[in-house]
Amino acid sequence: VPRGNRYFVPGQIYHLTHRCHNRQFLLRFAHDKNAYRKKLREAVSEFELALLDYCQTSNHVHLLAFAEETEQISGFMQMVEGEFAQSYNRRKHRSGAYWDDRFHSTTIQSGQHLVECMTYIALNMGRCGVVQHPREWDWCGYHELMGFRKRFRVLDITTLLSLLACDDISDFRRQYEWRLNEKIARSVMAREPRWTEAIAVGSESFVRQIATLIKGRQSLEITGEGENWSLKEGETSYHVPHRVNHKESRSFQWDEAP
């Protein structure tokens, strides 16, 4: 059963990443990626968790989810990763590990940082040169976010819009498409380790609050500047007396795109 790094705080957005064992391309075939997405739908329904975005590659997955309770994340990942791995091994007459031991979770602040994380996830296959635009890759959230996928949907668009303080799905789609095209046009698609290696990403106040709420962790480090800060394992501990308030961080200007 896959295990996470257990940096969980209730009522947060999590970017979950997990690699196939030894970076093997165990998801390279379309029917395997489709089977994984089917298991995603089943697990979302089972644990009533809000899946906001995803991208399946040939050797790892990105899942962006919002959970009110930390147990939802653990149960969700055990069902998706564990049951899919067992099914795969049975079909392929295979034994041994399917996933690397632990999946990684990065807590993402709502609003601006959520949009940036979604953009990063969407451009994953472009970074490795497989496609030029996420519309060319079937196994990602782009098609559902843009309204192209009508059947077998897995994303919770209502919760996503709430976390972005956006009332109009058309505004979201216009801004989302513009951001993707702008980064593609400027070739701004380099890997950014903070989205997949940090414990939390957001404003300075947000990551400080997350650091306080992670119990039993004595070695944490906060780095960044401006509005972009990250929390990671390190040598410094922080104490902030307040809980995270997502309502203060959801404001996002949706009319920036031309």
Where do the language-model regions lie?
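N-terminal functional module of multi-domain proteins
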Residues: H62-L64
